[in-house]
């Protein structure tokens, strides 16, 4: 059983343990059973065995995580108590999707789906207990707020001539192929930001994070490549983006949307992830696109 230590807990838009009085009621959360559990693998067995090249991890996806969440509410009257129960039943409705955030020494959050009706196992008039069961499809904890870093995209050397020796990230130009131009760089000075063609982002957790990648045109299909230099992953995309087009790639769900249209079948290569620690993502482009942008949005991710 996870001990709460009176940490402030937010479930959806309801706050617990923060000392505020809402309509004559004080809301407490003292039970987060399962919060400290780590993700377990779901074993998939095939009677035909596995073919060459199949990654073992693909056959052992992570199980969902179940939690029991509960606490108590102090009320000024039985009438206020009934109103508080109605409020909890409304906000903790069955099959609703909520985010649970615990403000501890390291604030963490988890997205859950309510899988039972809220229960009130004990009621003494001036206070009552509440209990609800939830399921987290993605069993890892994330930071309450994401990191979002944007970089612009250039290919030609003329842009980098504006940099002096005081900014040595792009001093040496290397034309390694007729399609993709790359640059040698000192990225130590860009550990938390976005530079032309490059995003340096840190995952401060201890589990792999899966970012949302947003690309804004104009970009010519197959004229660019997204590379995570820290993991060796590479992704190309065979679709033109106009100046008003925005492509959103979800690397966890492995989906890509151009507006409301699913276009993940244009993706070739790897769906990149962010390993714990520093990650360097670089866009290699063959055509100058000063109006094009890439934004990487990611949460720090923990195993527990």
Question: Model features per residue range: what roles?
Answer:
Residues 47, 52-79, 126-140, 279:
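Oligomerization/assembly interface segments of phage tail-like spikes and tubes
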Residues 97-144:
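Short beta-strand and beta-hairpin "edge-sheet" elements
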